[in-house]
Each structure stands twice: as structure tokens, then as C-alpha cells.
């Protein structure tokens, strides 16, 4: 199957997603279940599934939704979460992760989706897909639940590289704005630079330099720069894109996930406290379910590697079938919008 050459009987083009079946905490069964959920909702998705064929074939055969829509590529080796990226690159050419990326490199698939080791996935992606011309450091863009109309903000870098100088942060702003433009349909995304305060004199010298660089490039790149923002603005309405280095971004991401879990646990504990509180929970069930859906990390599952000659979506390692399906939905939307080509054009015009 070619990346966009397969056609459904209706005549509509089918977008092929390359899926790494191995490496996630839940194993290949959850990945295949997520694929089946996506296939049932969207007839325009096809898959190339990578992993040990002996394990994958029976799982796929059980899912009627996947009949005739999956090609299995036998890849016996599995990249584990504790494997060192440098070792994986040297010795992992028979792995499902390597094979999944190769399908994108060869043009057989439009996007790669993996739940595996983040460091190994990024290093493999950089080596096999290469960086876009002019990009210094690729970044991971993640979705953050927000009060904006699109219900999510974009934060990058989510952990691809703990280092980022002023030029890197400027490029993150450019790539993040392009992602928001294509993913959310925003004509002029608002971009903020994460700092310890909003005043222009605050923060490290490198951040102040990045502030000036982003401000100088905003108009030509069709985004609005709102200046420095603080951690409390991550879920807010001040901006649509938050730019930071990978260390800060990853700490913020994990803190947000932990806080969301704590809030959910405390709510369950409070509503189970007495018969009256249990009655209150029953009366508020619809509203609570709506709130849970808004902040459910599975709905925003999928960090996108930006700055490469190809699109890679990193799903959470602990993703269940719902989480995998969300990552595949994101991959389809990016493929449908020709995201990689549009991002490359934006970057080329800015350098």
C-alpha cells in the first residue's frame, strides 16, 4: 500500500498510518484494539503494523474492523523502555520501531505512531527521516487541556532535548504556530514564551534574547507573540502555543498529569464520603462526566515530533486502546492536512 495510493470502494483516498505495535506498557493487544476503534470510526485509514508477526496476526484476525486494512511487517526485536537510545540505534534495525519509521521514510505511510521509548524514537527519527533544512533541534509538541475555544493549547518542547538556546526557542515558536494553524485551524495563533514572570526584564539572558527574536519574526510568520507567560497560563486563554525548553516542558507536563490524577482521586474520595455525597455525585453525574472528558489525558494522547522530514506521533507508553485511538486520530488529521509539507514550507520561508 502506498502512503496515499490505497482507495476505499467509495473512491476516497485512504491514508496509511505506520504503527509500532511493541514497546508500550499495555502490549500489542492494546495497540491493535486502538487501531480497531479508529478503523470503525474512519473508513479512510489503513495501517502498516510492525512487530513479531506470530503475535500480531492472531490479534488482527480477531478484529473484523481491520479486515483488509492492515499489512503486517514482521519485526522480531522490541525496543524496551529502559534501553539506551544510542544502543538501540546501533543494534535495533530489526526492531518494530525502526521498521515503523522506515515505512514513513520510504513513502509507504504518511505518519508513524509509537508508544515506545521516547529517546530511542526521537533519535531513530532524526537519523532516518533527517531534520528539515535550517532546523537546529526537533521538538515534541504536546496538547494541554485549556479554556480556549479549541479546548487545548500546544506546548513545546515536551522533552525532546533539555537544551534550547534563543534560536531554538524561536524555531519552536515557528513550528508550534504552524502546528496550531493546521491542527486547530487558527489563522493567527498566539504564541507565549514560558518564564518565571511576564515582565520583560525577568528570566535568564537567553530567554530575553529569545523574546526579542520571536517578537522580530512574529509578523512575517503570521502569528501573534504575546510575550512572556507563566506556568499558570498553560491551561489558560492568553495564548494558543507555549514555548519552552525540553527540561521545563517535560517537568510541567508530568506535573500537570499528576495534578489531574490527584484532582480525580480527591473528587472520588469526596463523593464517596457519605450517603448524601454519593447522592450528590449521582445528581452531578452528567456534569462530572463532561469535566472528566475535558481533562482526560487519553483524549490529548500524542506528542508530535516537529522539525523532521516526516511526521511521527509519540503516544504515551501507558496508553490503553482509547489512548492509542486518539494518537491515530491525530496522525490521520496531520496526514490529511499535509502537515509535514506545510511546516517545511513555513520553515524554509523563515530562514
Predicted stretch roles:
Residues 20, 50-51, 73, 114-116, ...:
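Short beta-strand segments
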Residues 25-32, 56, 93-107, 111-125, ...:
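Short glycine/serine/threonine-rich phosphate/pyrophosphate-binding segments
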Residues 29-30, 42-48, 54-57, 162-231, ...:
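Glycine-rich phosphate/diphosphate-binding loop of Rossmann-like nucleotide-binding domains
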Residues 2-57:
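N-terminal phosphate-binding or glycine-rich loops at protein starts, especially the Walker A/P-loop
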Residues 126-151, 155, 238-242, 246-351:
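Glycine-rich phosphate/nucleotide-binding loop
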Residues 17-29, 89, 160-170, 314-321:
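Short, glycine-rich nucleotide/cofactor-binding loops
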Residues 64-109:
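Phosphate/nucleotide-donor binding subsite
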Residues 53-54, 76-78, 119, 160-162, ...:
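Glycine-rich beta-alpha junction loops
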Amino acid at each position: 500500500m502506498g502512503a496515499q495510493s490505497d482507495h476505499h470502494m467509495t473512491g476516497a483516498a485512504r491514508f496509511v498510518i505506520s504503527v509500532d505495535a511493541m514497546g508500550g506498557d499495555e502490549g500489542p493487544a492494546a495497540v491493535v484494539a486502538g487501531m480497531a476503534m479508529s478503523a470503525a470510526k474512519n473508513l479512510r485509514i489503513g495501517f502498516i503494523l510492525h512487530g513479531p508477526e506470530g503475535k500480531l496476526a492472531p490479534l488482527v484476525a480477531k478484529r473484523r474492523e481491520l479486515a483488509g486494512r492492515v499489512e503486517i511487517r514482521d519485526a522480531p526485536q522490541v525496543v524496551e523502555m529502559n534501553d539506551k537510545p544510542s544502543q538501540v540505534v546501533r543494534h535495533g534495525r530489526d526492531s518494530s520501531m525502526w521498521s515503523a519509521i522506515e515505512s514513513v521514510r520510504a513513502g509507504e505511510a504518511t505518519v508513524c505512531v509509537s508508544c515506545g521509548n521516547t529517546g530511542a524514537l526521537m533519535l531513530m527519527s532524526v537519523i532516518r527521516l533527517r531534520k528539515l533544512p535550517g532546523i537546529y533541534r526537533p521538538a515534541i509538541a504536546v496538547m494541554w487541556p485549556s479554556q480556549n475555544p479549541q479546548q487545548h493549547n500546544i506546548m513545546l518542547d515536551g522533552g525532546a532535548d533539555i537544551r534550547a538556546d534563543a534560536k531554538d526557542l524561536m524555531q519552536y515558536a515557528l513550528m508550534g504556530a504552524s502546528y496550531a494553524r493546521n491542527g486547530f485551524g487558527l489563522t493567527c495563533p498566539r504564541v507565549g514564551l514560558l518564564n518565571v514572570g511576564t515582565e520583560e526584564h525577568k528570566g535568564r539572558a537567553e530567554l530575553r534574547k529569545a523574546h526579542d527574536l520571536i517578537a522580530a519574526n512574529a509578523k512575517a510568520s503570521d502569528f501573534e507573540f504575546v510575550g512572556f507567560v507563566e506556568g499558570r497560563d498553560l491551561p489558560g486563554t492568553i495564548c494558543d502555543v507555549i514555548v519552552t525548553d525540553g527540561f521545563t516542558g517535560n517537568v510541567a507536563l508530568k506535573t500537570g498529569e499528576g495534578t489531574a490524577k490527584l484532582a480525580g482521586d480527591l473528587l472520588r474520595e469526596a463523593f464517596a464520603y457519605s450517603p448524601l455525597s454519593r447522592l450528590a455525585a449521582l445528581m452531578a453525574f452528567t456534569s462530572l462526566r463532561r469535566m472528566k472528558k475535558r481533562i482526560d489525558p487519553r483524549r490529548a494522547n500524542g506528542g508530535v515530533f516537529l522539525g523532521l522530514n516526516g511526521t511521527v506521533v509519540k503516544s504515551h507508553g501507558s496508553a490503553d486502546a482509547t489512548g492509542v485511538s486518539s494518537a491515530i486520530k491525530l496522525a490521520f488529521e496531520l496526514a490529511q492536512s499535509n502537515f509535514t509539507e506545510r511546516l517545511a514550507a513555513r520553515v524554509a520561508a523563515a530562514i
